[in-house]
């Protein structure tokens, strides 16, 4: 029996394929690689099997990303269809409703996206009001509902749309959804 090191993601993938209590990692890998159940003195693994195993290791992460993206899309669709959003006359409130929905649906992706979305001279997102206010004398900020984030709010409607679209693109949301949001802020 030999010992090998595998990264956490691969370890969790192999462990998730356990079919019986006490099944060893060797048994699981033999099943996944379609090798005989009894150990052989030497087994030649073909290149295509190695590539197939690499592809299998990527599947859980891709499925998680797709599931998370679906959750975000549904949350945004819900806001767009809500009477609260459609009856709201103030652009800043519509802006905050959508930002809140994006955060609630995928806080991790939202957080990463805010790090990449900023103006040439202003910070658009921060975890405290003072960080945003420090970027200019006439800057106003509001807290995004149900999130730890603050956002700059004294932009015109079109700029709010640009900020939202940039954030959604950074979150890797579908272009057609981004285009629908952009149309709301023209």
UniProtKB/Swiss-Prot annotation:
Keyword DNA-binding listed: yes
Pfam families attached to this UniProt entry: SeqA (PF03925), SeqA_N (PF17206)
Entry's Gene Ontology cellular component terms: cytoplasm
One GO term (biological process): regulation of DNA-templated transcription
Subcellular location per the Swiss-Prot or TrEMBL entry: Cytoplasm
Xref: SUPFAM superfamilies: Replication modulator SeqA, C-terminal DNA-binding domain, Ribbon-helix-helix
A GO term, aspect molecular function: DNA binding
Alphabetical keyword list: Cytoplasm, DNA replication inhibitor, DNA-binding
Functional note: Negative regulator of replication initiation, which contributes to regulation of DNA replication and ensures that replication initiation occurs exactly once per chromosome per cell cycle. Binds to pairs of hemimethylated GATC sequences in the oriC region, thus preventing assembly of replication proteins and re-initiation at newly replicated origins. Repression is relieved when the region becomes fully methylated.
NCBIfam families: PRK11187.1 (NF008389)
Quaternary context: Homodimer. Polymerizes to form helical filaments.
Record-stated family: Belongs to the SeqA family.
Name of the featured protein: Negative modulator of initiation of replication
Organism, as annotated: Glaesserella parasuis serovar 5 (strain SH0165)
Lineage: Bacteria, Pseudomonadati, Pseudomonadota, Gammaproteobacteria, Pasteurellales
Protein's gene: seqA
């Amino acid at each position: 029996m030999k010992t090998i090191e595998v990264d956490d993601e691969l370890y969790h993938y192999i462990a998730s394929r356990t079919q019986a209590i006490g099944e060893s990692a060797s048994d699981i890998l033999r099943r996944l690689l379609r090798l005989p159940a009894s150990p052989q003195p030497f087994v030649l693994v073909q290149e295509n099997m190695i590539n197939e195993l690499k592809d299998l290791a990527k599947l859980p992460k891709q499925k998680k990303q797709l599931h998370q993206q679906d959750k975000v899309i549904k949350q945004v669709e819900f806001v767009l269809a809500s009477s609260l959003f459609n009856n709201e006359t103030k652009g800043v409130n519509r802006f905050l409703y959508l930002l809140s929905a994006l955060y609630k649906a995928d806080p991790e992706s939202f957080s990463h996206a805010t790090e990449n979305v900023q103006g040439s001279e202003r910070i658009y997102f921060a975890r405290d009001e003072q960080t945003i206010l420090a970027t200019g004398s006439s800057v106003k900020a509001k807290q995004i509902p149900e999130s730890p984030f603050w956002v700059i709010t004294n932009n015109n409607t079109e700029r709010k749309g640009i900020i939202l679209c940039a954030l959604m693109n950074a979150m890797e949301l579908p272009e057609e959804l981004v285009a629908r949001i952009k149309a709301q802020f023209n």
